[in-house]
Each structure stands twice: as structure tokens, then as C-alpha cells.
Amino acid sequence: MSNIFTKTKLDLNQPLSPTQGLILLSSYPKSGNTWTRLFFYALQNRAKEIDLDHFAKNISTMDSQKTHFASVLGVDPNSLTQQEIAETIPKVQRYLALKSKNRELIKTHTANGEFGGTPTMDFSVIRAVVYIIRNPLDVVASFASHMGYGFDRSIKAMATSKNWLQAETKELRDEAPQVAQLMGSWSEHVAGWTGRPDPRVTVVRYEDLKHDTVVSFKRVVDGLGLRKTRAEVAEAVAKTDFAQIQAKEAKKGFTETVHKNQKFFRKGQTGGWREELSDDQVKEVIRHHAFQMNRFGYIPKEYHDFAKGVMIESQTAKHFIAEARRERQAQEKNIKRRSKPGKKNAGERPQVAVPRTSVMFPSAIKAQNPTNK
């Protein structure tokens, strides 16, 4: 990246034309986002074979690319704090929408919500979203390989609220092509994008893309309002067969790989967790994500009873937390009423037993409703 950071002259306050806007391909990392982008690349380039180098340079971009942040702010993106990144993401999205005359396909791993009071998405420029979700039990191993983590560390990262995707050292962060990306936990990410109905959002499971590929991709294409026949979709699917893509990466490499000695297109399997995760690790994933896993049919049959217990315990805890909050608010209101000037014993602050809990709320990431934007 150049050392000169020139701010765009584009007026970011101008309205979009009817032909402009963003189509987001959103997912938690290692959930099929790049494979889906390859599919769209094949769909747009019917006469061409898949060229990973050409694909990386010419099909879609990410809303976290440092070059976009430099254009919007005119400063070195490496100098930005997490709060500044969060505040700039919606501006980058508007910039990307305005700089193209047509609708732009954009990749994002950013959580849909708020950080420090700032919305992470500008839904006024987003025309459609494809949200790809994958069983977190399979994500664990793939994410661990991608980041160079062990499985336990991957599980912990996926369960961490306020989690940011970034390299570990400042040197690697400065060299990375993207700024840090706000993901939150796996459950926060899923809830933020799928928790409220929105006609613009098409949700597709990675497992359905793998096992009913043509039908599932046709549903995605139809959801975006693209006029493509089943035959055209099937042709694009054939060109992006996972084994073929793996062979191309093995021969020429792939620019989106984080670690040089590791594969980006690892296995692409469903159910691989059964051979990779221990019983304790499976339970740890379910313990953190039971509610969202249950919504999408990801809880293995043999763990149904365990997951049920987790969800009952969680709901009970939420009930007591809510009760404690209401009691604390009532007590604080009573204290203020007694402390008003002119009242008897004004200025006295009686000792009140305030219920305490180890649970911190609210979360730094709060799901926003796209339909209200």
C-alpha cells in the first residue's frame, strides 16, 4: 500500500441511483463465503475456466479492505482504533455503493449490530444480502486451520463476545490487506443476521449448498432477483467443484490464505467434526451456541438431551437476571425519590442489598433490525 493516503473526492452524502447499491455475501469466517463468490464468478464468466488469481482481483471486494478505509478517511488505516473502524465501516459501504454505477457484490464477515453505539451496517445502501451459515462444529476445525489455532482456542474465539478477527502481532496486522473485523461470537453473528425477518436477506446453509447444490444456489440466485436458468446455475456449479478448486490452489496457491504453509480450501466437508473434535469439545461448542444451533438443525441427535439442559439452564439464568435488573431499578428509583430536597431524611442514602450477577449486560454488540433502516 502506498504511504500517501488520498481521501476520495466522492460526495458520500449524495443519494444512490436506482441501479446502485450493495449485494452483501455475509458469513462467519470459513462458512463457504469464498466458494459462493467463486460460484458467482463462474456464473458471470460462462466461457472461462476458474482462474484463482483473476478471481481474487476481479470478483467482489471486502468492506474491510484497508484501501477503502484509506480512501474514505485519507489516513493510514493501520492507525485506526477498533471504535474508529466500527464508525467507518458504514461509510466504507456507502463509498463502495456510490463508486460503482451498478450494484456491487461485497464480501463481509462483519457482525450486523452495534459497537460502541455505532451501527455496523448502512442498510440504506444495501439492496440484498446472502447470509451463509455453517455448523459451528465444522467451523471450529476449519477456522483453527485458517488462523493457525488449536481447536480449544478456536472454540474459545468463536464463543467470545466483542471478538475481532485480526492477526496476533502488530507487524502482521500492519501487513494484512484488511483492517480488524468485528465478528462477535458465532451466535451473535448468526443472531444479528438472521434474528429478524427481512425480505432482502436470503439465508442458506452451507450443508444445503454441499448436498443439494444446484437447487440451493438457484434459490440464492432467485433471492437476488437474477435472471439465470437452472442450466446456467448447474454449469457454474460444475466449474466450482470443490475438488477442482483444491487442485488449482495446490498448483498455483491462493492470495486469501493467511499462512503460507496452510490450505485455504481445506476439506469443505460436512460432519467432519465427528473425526476431529472430542466429546468435551463438542459439548463446549453446544454449551455456547445451543439456541442458534437448534434454530438451524445443527445439534447432533446424541447431544439433544445435553443441549436441552443447556437451553433450560440458560433461560432460567436469563429469568433471574431480568428479575434482578427490575429489582435493582426499583430500588434505585426508590433511593432517588427519598433523596429529593424537602423530603424527610433528605440526603440520607439507606443501605440497600442490590442483587449482583457475574453476567455482564448489555453486550457490546446488539442486533439491529434491518427493516427499520
Stretch-by-stretch model annotation:
Residues F39, V139-S142, R219, G223, ...:
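Generic recognition of well-ordered alpha-helical segments
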Residues H211, R230-A231, D279-D280:
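Alpha-helix N-capping/helix-start residues
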